[in-house]
Amino acid sequence: MDPTWEYLQRSVSLQGGIVANYQQYANATVMDDGENQDFTACISPQLKMTWEPVEQGSLYARLRYTKNRVDLAQKGIVLANLLETNVGDKDNGRIRLQKLYYTQKLMNEHAFVAFGKTDGETYLDTNAFANDSRTQFMGQPLVNNPMLDDEDEYAPFVALGVTPVRDLHLLVLGQSSSWPLASQHKDIWENMLGHPLAAAQATFSPQLNGHEGHYRLYGWLQSYDHPSLTGPGYEKGWGIGLSLDQWVTRDMGLFARVGHNNPHVYEVPWFWSVGISVRGLVPRREEDTFGLGISGLKANPDTPHDGTEIHLEAYYRIRLSEHFFVSPDFQYVLNPLGNNDETGIFASMLRGEFCF
């Protein structure tokens, strides 16, 4: 065998797939293409590559295309969207090199340094059961902290991690920002040290009765000026949060999140979510996954409503073959925008996946 080809087979891996979603609303419509529509849809193929050029070093790249219709959050009907896969107008219908970064492990894998381009949520607020809208829950508040997610973007970054003692992992991260929630924006490659995102996270990963778990405490600062909700002037964006996941049996896991964000600049100063993930719930369907979760977003009292928007979601991911999956998903939103007098919104969705 040719040595070059043998080296590539050993050091390079490729993965890819395509996800398609169709979501139907009840008691809600959005204006799209000049008409009121009661549905949204999305299709998103991607290609991922990992190359290990040196020992304990890896280069990761992800190319993704997403085409979607508008959703409820984009039209200001809910505080958090019901289809997290959707992207905004800037990226809709474009092929994007979302991630391209290098990671070098150090000190016998007790530390690492990473740099390149990715989103902060590659490292922050992760969760074993509620973190991937392509395979798990689909609504934003059961995928990430919505306020962190709204500030998050794919941009140049540097991250440092260390494991000082067993089961404790520490991380610091700095990232260029386009100032996504400011009245004026900049390019992510322009003045990268100008009011960047800074974040830190501590993760405790114990084994409880032989079952893996992760308990994360994180904080972040978006250092550009945000318009104040409480009066004239500006303040920095910041937030702190917990993201927890714990296997309790071989096939059942629990998760929870809670976050507090600067109440002077964000529509949602408090957020929480809890849920369960079960493999093989149906007899003889060991590779299927069932998920059930509930989340709450407390509306800021300085906005028109001050109630709590509640999201309930259930999905069942059916394995048809090694490469094909299909997932019916149901969501219900109580008190949209924190308005206790508003009619609830029901959404049913079907997701199809092909992966290789």
Each model region followed by its residue ranges:
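Outer-membrane beta-barrel biogenesis signature
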Residues: M1-Q15, G34, D119-S133, L142, ...
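Repeated loop/turn-to-beta-strand initiation elements of outer-membrane beta-barrel proteins
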Residues: V12, E55-L59, E109-V113, R166-V172, ...
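Transmembrane beta-barrel strands of outer-membrane/channel proteins
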Residues: G16-Y22, A61-Y65, V113-K117, V172-S176, ...
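Residues that define the transmembrane beta-barrel architecture of outer-membrane proteins
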Residues: Q24, E35-I43, G93-Q98, D152-P156, ...
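Residues on the lipid-exposed face of transmembrane beta-strands in outer-membrane beta-barrel proteins
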Residues: P45-W51, K99-Q104, F115, V158-V162, ...
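Surface-exposed coil loops of outer-membrane beta-barrel proteins
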Residues: L72-Y101, N108-L197, Q201
